[in-house]
């Protein structure tokens, strides 16, 4: 579980110590550290990190547990656009490996671009649900900025890329991760091989 208040996950004096308490496999630790772009932050106290850096460190700590079900509460909170794109790619990779991902978020643009299914909870119940395109296109209040701006002319547009494509423009090329993701290590002193990401 990645909680909304990620500071609750940190109990050690450095990011490295916090991560090392989860796994003793140095290769796995290096892999997840690189995946979450934490290499330059390992010697810092987790509370001295920015909000986005804390979010990445907390995500790394969760990934080291190799969950079959990944529960994320506001996972994009504090993240810059570049790492949001990397998070989207990472979640997609996890889904293709059979990991179930459930996330709660107010970041409707992220959900519209990344989710396989969306639901709106209201007063303890599911008020509406559906595939992202239908969910956001049919929702008058809880929808994306692109849908609000374009719905009178392009009712099915829910992302900026949808609007650009409908206007005859080309979608900007998707940015790759800053460098290729590290290769997962081979199983060492851990019970099962890490997910291939």
Spans of features found by a protein language model:
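Walker B catalytic motif
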Residues: 45, 74-75
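H-loop/switch region of ABC-family ATPase nucleotide-binding domains
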Residues: 105-106
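Conserved beta-strand-loop-alpha-helix hinge in the C-terminal portion
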Residues: 125-149
